[in-house]
């Protein structure tokens, strides 16, 4: 990567970094006369440090693969875009991806501790830290997060991890109007409830997911609100029920997914939206 950028800089060639090419905005599209630098083969997990709850990884690894790798240490990486099975960590960092769990756990920038980046000159820069607290100097790491490859090519990332959460409880509510579903979300926040997942799917999305999965998903509603709680057995059920009460107060038809297969179907529907549409 260093050599490629140094040569491109010498000859004035534009450089486009590419990860898994799963983004929809065209940020990784090639430019005529330019040089594409692909990181898709840079998939190694270089280190997992359970004591400091961090992982050091190359940028080409898929989000889901990294998540599964750290699970064996009793840890998890919260940012989980719906495309997590086929989007890369480098792309997540470059676009500051969120995910289905961002309502509780935040977005990618909240977990990037440090980066190794190759600049346009071919120079390698290391930013950030390996500690929870790091307040000295300019926060160059956050400058690169979300920069979509315009400032350099990410070649290594140090990411914060969390202790593995409990198996989530899942529920959903059907609404006759998207406005009622949106008002429910606002009411959930106002009530101080913090589910581990809170997602809306409108009727168009539900039909697309149903066709794609060949599944019997609800299609006679204007919107479906999906939520989860990872607080554990009793606390999780209580939080699920509390959100259900809020949804019912806004004319939602609440469904508690006690069957793991039903819960998995709802989650698969949400994760399939990108390709289904």
Give each language-model segment a name.
Residues 1-277:
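Noncatalytic alpha-helical scaffold of FAD-dependent oxidoreductases
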């Amino acid at each position: 990567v260093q050599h490629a950028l140094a040569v491109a800089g010498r000859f004035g060639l534009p450089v486009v970094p590419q990860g898994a090419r799963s983004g929809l905005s065209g940020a990784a599209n090639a430019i005529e006369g330019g040089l594409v630098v692909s990181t898709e083969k840079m998939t190694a997990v270089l280190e997992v440090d359970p004591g400091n709850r961090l992982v050091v990884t190359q940028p080409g690894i898929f989000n889901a693969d990294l998540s599964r790798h750290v699970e064996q240490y009793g840890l998890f990486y919260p940012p989980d875009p719906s495309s997590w099975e086929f989007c890369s960590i480098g792309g997540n960092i470059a676009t500051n991806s969120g995910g289905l769990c961002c309502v509780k756990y935040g977005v990618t920038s909240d977990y990037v501790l440090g980066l190794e980046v190759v600049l346009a000159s071919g120079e390698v820069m290391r930013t950030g830290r390996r500690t929870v607290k790091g307040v000295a100097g300019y926060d160059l790491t956050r400058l690169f997060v979300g920069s979509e490859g315009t400032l350099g090519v990410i070649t290594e990332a140090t990411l914060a991890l969390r202790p593995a959460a409990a198996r989530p409880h899942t529920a959903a509510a059907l609404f006759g109007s998207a406005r009622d579903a949106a008002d429910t979300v606002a009411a959930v926040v106002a009530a101080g409830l913090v589910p581990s997942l809170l997602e809306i799917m409108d009727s168009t999305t539900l039909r697309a997911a149903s066709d794609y999965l060949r599944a019997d998903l609800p299609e006679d509603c204007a919107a479906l609100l999906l939520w989860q709680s990872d607080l554990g057995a009793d606390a999780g059920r209580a939080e699920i029920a509390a959100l259900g009460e809020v949804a019912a107060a806004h004319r939602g038809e609440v469904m508690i997914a006690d069957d793991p297969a039903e819960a998995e179907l709802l989650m698969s529907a949400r994760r399939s939206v990108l390709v289904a549409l």
